[in-house]
Amino acid sequence: FGMTLLIPAACRRRARLFDNPMLKVDTFNFVAVEGFGWFEDAMFGMRRGMPRPRNVMVPSIMAGIWLGYKRICLLGADHSWLSTLTVNDRNEVVSVQPHFYKEDEREEKRIRQEYVRHPLHEVLDSMAIAFRSYHRLQAYAASRGVSIVNATPGSMIDAFPRGEIS
């Protein structure tokens, strides 16, 4: 069976590296589009952009819509970031985000340094952007007859109806 690999449009020249008859390479614009709803819908429909992509979920869901799927089921999308945040006695934001894999020491250090550079309101603003993008995706998907179901127990994402993978 064949497979479609989606890559950012900025990397389209690298698509030649994937010379395989079972692999179709398609591109998408990794550009945040914001404005009037009709404008956003037009840009999304032409694949010119998407709601602000704060993480891999936004482009993944948008890719599913662009590829014509009528039902998109989210698994492992707990987004429990809020419960991982604290501020230490030096007023540094600390976030310990558990993953199903073990972070190596370099990655843990990188994450610590990343959060220390930002005050809490900036971290929360970034999270709010992600959750706002999910609500925009839900509205766009519904207007296209696409159902997005969140099948992740305990998920903090409130934009998509809860459901089962079935």
Q: Would you name each region that the model predicts?
A:
Residues F1-S166:
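Metal-ion/cofactor- or nucleotide/acyl-coenzyme-handling active-site neighborhoods
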